[in-house]
Amino acid sequence: MRKAEIKFNDHTAGWLSQDENGFHFIYDKNYLFNDKSVAISLTLPLQENTYDSPILFPFFDGLIPEGWLLNIVEKNWKLDQRDRMGLLLLAAKIALVQ
């Protein structure tokens, strides 16, 4: 299993993971129950339940480089462009800024 801490405005907003069943995102309890917290994406509204998907959630997939930059990333890091979680983990320290 691979797992990433998702930050929003320097606070742990949740956890993104990948296992043999696909991708999972869950909001951190402290973040979820803070009155000032907002969803990290319109497609991932605040909720207690885990989001599950067979593919990387589009919001996170959109953070991965594309085009010529993806080619450079693949060449330098020797990653397969189909390894979306690997690309995401290496391409960015996930810190979302409002």
Feature map (PLM): residue ranges:
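Broad phosphate/nucleotide-binding scaffolds in NTP-utilizing and phosphate-metabolizing enzymes
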Residues: 1-98
